[in-house]
Structures are given as structure tokens and as C-alpha cells.
Swiss-Prot record:
Coiled coil: none annotated. This is Ribosome biogenesis protein NSA1. GO terms for cellular component: nucleolus; preribosome, large subunit precursor. Disulfide bonds: none annotated. GO terms for biological process: ribosomal large subunit biogenesis; rRNA processing. Involved in the biogenesis of the 60S ribosomal subunit. The gene is NSA1. Its main location: nucleus. Residues 386-397 have a biased composition (Basic residues). Residues 372-382, 401-411 have a biased composition (Acidic residues). Component of the pre-66S ribosomal particle. It comes from Debaryomyces hansenii (strain ATCC 36239 / CBS 767 / BCRC 21394 / JCM 1990 / NBRC 0083 / IGC 2968). Belongs to the NSA1 family. Keywords: Nucleus, Ribosome biogenesis, rRNA processing.
Amino acid sequence: MKILVTSDDTGAVKEVVCSRGTDTSKQDAKQPKSIKNICSEPGASVRTRVLHMVNFKSTFLVASRLGGSVTIYDLNHEEYELVHTYQLAISNEDKPISLIELEEFDVVVVAFESGKVFVINLNNGKFDLDPIEIQLPGKKGISAFINNPHEAGVFACGGKENDARIIRLFEGEITKDVFEAENKQEFFQPDVIFTARNVKNDHLDLRPPIWISSILFFEEKPKDGYKFLTSTRYGQVRIYDTTHGKRPIQDYKVCEKPIVTLNFADSEEEVIVSDTHNLVAKYSLAQIDSKAFKTHSASAGEITKPVSKLLGKFSAGGNTGAIVGVNIFDDEIISTGGLDRYLRTYDISSREILAKVYLGVQISDVLMLDSEDEEEEEPESEMGDKRKKNIEKRRRKALEAEENESDEEELWNQLEENNKTKIEKKKRRI
């Protein structure tokens, strides 16, 4: 397996090559084949650390850094050579919250807390087109920004006291001509097509606070509408159907701590969440207990709420801090990293831990490039000796099996002979 992990303490990235069964916390377990620092430019530090990474067409590693730079590296170069840097015009306090690849348009999109969005056309590796800056409608900041992978040009965002909104950023294709046009800004006219409404007041008639942390679009959507999922910094997961009003159609409390990441598991009926404590868990969106949560209020009496079924936790390997970097690879493997400085990979279906590697740095993001284990090469002479030993071992086992069979036959024959002798003696007595 080959996994890239951000190194928050140094501003670089670590490449980890390991196989299933690797565990650096055990001396007698497999150890990583290699761990090396990459993407370390002069002046890289915690102030310019990498927060997000994407694998762009298996050709480039695109990284968004604190400070507003977007760096492009050659994935096919052994040392991940830096090929270009975009410096985006943002304030010193602004922070990137999302990095999205739109491969069909040769574009990446970077969103910032301030609501600024930059669209960057890589132009087939020429990097000669200037990024286009877009300001999202509204004055409140955002903490979540995601594209709809099933409909080009449609995005969703939300933040603290800024409920989820669906925005159409553009229509049609983002071609090279758009970036070269004098009126290119006119192509990107953000249009809010849906704004969510807060849930009803609680049993004490208090308004629930709003803080969106992540958003996901469902592939299946209603006619003339959208279906999407949000998580909050108050431990809730909510499902929206825009054809059924502005409030969520389902609202589940899944944990007590703020949810940091939200991902679909191997199907859209299951989600994986991580929080600011040490939770990484899989929940069902289809298996719901409508009265699982019960509490009693002096004014309202007994209160029941629906709860999404917990399918299991990714707890093998002992998470001891917030998990802030989560990557799903081919709907089969989940890689995690966070404050406890460990990289862990799990099988999504069984939740079995596949590898655990201590890196000594805090982690903001992880990105798996390859899930295959590299076989260790052996000299031909050693391989020949091993084959001979295996053949000899199999031959001995076969001989032992034959000897055991002959011994068993002899034993049965002896028993039969003894039985015959006993029967004859009885007949004589009679």
C-alpha cells in the first residue's frame, strides 16, 4: 500500500509504503517498507502546512496549503517534483476548507472560510491560466463546501450559524476558452437554489444552534430536486430532500462530540463519521430505531427520538485523539490520521485493521494512492532453495500419510481377526 500523509509539524508530506499486517507498535510485527518526506519546499513550516490533497488524474498531486498557496507535484516522479505553485489572493486569517477535483474539466476548486472560491484550470499541465475568484453569496463564513458529483456546476456549503445551501456556480462546460475570455467572470454567477431551514425548537422551546461541518450529495435524487446529507459540530447527522420542504426529513444524534468528517461507506445507506475525541464509526441510514433515545422532561414528559443504528467502530489500534484526516479508497479501504500521530488503515466491511504506522507528526489529511501490497523480491537461488524445501516437505507429508493409512489398515485387520477368534470361542462353548 502507498499512502500520502500530511506532516503538520513540518509543512511537508510523508509517503508511507507498507503492507497489510504492518504495526510499528509491535516489534515482532511487519514494519513499513519505507517512510520518506516529500513536498518539502524551502520555507515550508507549520504556517504553510498542507491541509488537503487530491490525486488529479493519477498524474499530479494537488495540495492546498495554509497561507493561500496551491502546489502541484508530479506523481510519476520518484521525489514528487514540484511543477507549479498558485498563490491565491486571500487575507492572512483566511483558511482553505475544501479542495475539489473536477477532472472532466481539467479543473480544481479551492474554497476558503471567508466564502471565497477559486477555480483553477490546469490546462493539461501547462499551468498558464490564471485562477478565477468567486465570492459566494452571504456575509457569513463557511466550514463545509462540496460539489455534487452527479451534476456539474452544483455545490453545497454551510457553516457556523450558516445553514446548508445549494448553489449553482456555473452552467455548461468550463473550457479553456472560458479562462481566456475577457468576460470570464460572467460565466461564474453563483445562484442559491436552496437554503435549508433550522429544525424546530426543542422541548424547552430553545432554538438549536447551527454549525455545519460536512455535506454529501446522494446519487439518487427526487425529480426537480436534490437529496443530501449534513453533519454538525453538535453530533447530528441530517438528511434533506429539497422537494419535501426546507427542514431535514431525518435528524439523528450519533455522538456527543463535534463531527469532523463525514463519508459514505461502501454504499450510500451507510456513513462513516469521526469526531473531535477519538470516534471513527459506521452508522446505518436505513436501519433506524424510532424510539431508541429516551429522556424525561418535567415540562414535556417523556421524549423519544430516532437513532441511526451503530454498525461498528473502527477502534482496533486504539485511537487516542481526534481523527481529522479520512480517505476512502475504492469503497474498500479507509485510511485515518489525526492528533495521535498514527496512520491507520482498515477494511471498510469488516472494520479489521490492515496497518498501523507511527509517524511522529500531527496529521490533517491522508490520501491513498495504491492499495496493493508490494511483494518482496527474493534472489533466484533463495527462491530455488525454498521450492526444493517445500517439495521435500510435501513428499515427506505424503509418505507419512501413506504410512498412517497402512498402519490404520493393519490395525483394522487385527481387530477383525480378534473379533473372529472371539466368535469362534463362543461357538465352541455353546
